[in-house]
């Protein structure tokens, strides 16, 4: 399908792209496309390394004492349930 594209067809496609997007926006679009490709490549590499790490990890059953400690939920700083009610501000200015 693409084997039949010659130089005139490619030039025509490039001219249409320049007319559609404008010459000023093309460098920014190419830069963002490059960043997206780089991010996609790094994410794919990270997924492969995670898969290799999961395969290399031993499949021992979890220790019951250890799993109970992992399930403990700690309160977040500024947790609403443990905070005191806010008092109304006193009016310090005189009218």
UniProtKB/Swiss-Prot annotation:
GO BP term, pick one: protein transport by the Tat complex
Keywords of the record: Cell membrane, Membrane, Protein transport, Translocation, Transmembrane, Transmembrane helix, Transport
Compositionally biased tracts (Basic and acidic residues): 44-55
The keyword Cytoplasm appears for this protein: no
Compartments in which it is found: Cell membrane
Domain of life from the UniProt record: Bacteria
Region (Disordered): 44-95
Transmembrane segments: 1-21
GO MF terms held by the record: protein transmembrane transporter activity
Keyword hit for Nucleotide-binding: no
Cellular component terms (Gene Ontology): TAT protein transport complex
Family: Belongs to the TatA/E family.
Name of the protein in its database record: Sec-independent protein translocase protein TatA
